[in-house]
């Protein structure tokens, strides 16, 4: 798995009061709590979810 590219995603804003599709994108990326960081594969599907909630998350790599 070391040959595949990954992206670190951190949830920096709360999901309280957000629409359901934004909450679903965060859950799909594995983000549950504020300031939680997960490492996901750099795929078009994950990039789309990150793009949809870009105002809630911080990306690295």
Curated annotation (Swiss-Prot):
Keyword presence, Ribonucleoprotein: yes
GO biological process: translation
Top-level taxon: Bacteria
Cross-referenced Pfam families: Ribosomal_L30 (PF00327)
One GO location term (cellular component): cytosolic large ribosomal subunit
Gene Ontology molecular functions: structural constituent of ribosome
Record keywords: Ribonucleoprotein, Ribosomal protein
Keyword set includes Flavoprotein: no
InterPro entries the record matches: Ribo_uL30_ferredoxin-like_sf, Ribosomal_uL30_bac-type, Ribosomal_uL30_ferredoxin-like
Family: Belongs to the universal ribosomal protein uL30 family.
Family annotation (HAMAP family): Ribosomal_uL30_B
Quaternary structure and interacting proteins, as annotated: Part of the 50S ribosomal subunit.
The protein, known as: Large ribosomal subunit protein uL30
Lineage: Bacteria, Pseudomonadati, Pseudomonadota, Betaproteobacteria, Neisseriales
């Amino acid at each position: 798995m070391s040959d595949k590219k990954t992206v670190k995603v951190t949830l920096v804003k709360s999901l309280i009061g957000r629409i359901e599709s934004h909450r679903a994108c965060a859950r799909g990326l594995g983000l549950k709590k504020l300031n939680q960081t997960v490492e996901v594969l750099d795929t078009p599907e994950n990039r789309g979810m990150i793009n949809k909630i870009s105002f809630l998350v911080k990306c690295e790599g």
